[in-house]
Amino acid sequence: MFAIIQTGGKQVKVTEGQEIYVEKLDVEAGDTFEFTEVLATSDKIGHPYVEGAKVVAEVIKQGRQRKIIVFKYKRRKNYRRKQGHRQAYTKLVVKSIQG
């Protein structure tokens, strides 16, 4: 059974036991989190969400991705700007899909 959930402005297809990375959620490691914004399951399609459906996941860890470098440059104008960014994420493992 699979489900499509909406979190952090993105849509993610999940199955039971799958590990997923999503945008940072305000929960601690070891807690459980319920996604109620379920767009579809293997047998139902929501309009926009499936009524009574939820996906329960356990938080594995909070972390930050690799650093990416943003470099702005204009030739002949002595304009250079270098900036780094690390995106925060939450790693989850899907425990159950209901509905």
Curated annotation (Swiss-Prot):
PROSITE patterns listed in its UniProt record: RIBOSOMAL_L21
A GO MF term: rRNA binding
Database matches in InterPro entries: bL21-like, bL21-like_sf, Ribosomal_bL21, Ribosomal_bL21_CS
Pfam families reported for this sequence: Ribosomal_L21p
GO biological process: translation
Domain of life: Bacteria
Annotated Gene Ontology cellular component terms: cytoplasm; ribonucleoprotein complex; ribosome
Keywords noted in UniProt: Ribonucleoprotein, Ribosomal protein, RNA-binding, rRNA-binding
Protein family according to the UniProt entry: Belongs to the bacterial ribosomal protein bL21 family.
NCBIfam families the record matches: L21
Function: This protein binds to 23S rRNA in the presence of protein L20.
Assembly and oligomerization: Part of the 50S ribosomal subunit. Contacts protein L20.
PANTHER family to which the protein is assigned, alphabetical: 50S RIBOSOMAL PROTEIN L21 (PTHR21349), LARGE RIBOSOMAL SUBUNIT PROTEIN BL21M (PTHR21349:SF0)
Name of the protein this chain belongs to: Large ribosomal subunit protein bL21
Organism: Acholeplasma laidlawii (strain PG-8A)
GN (gene name): rplU
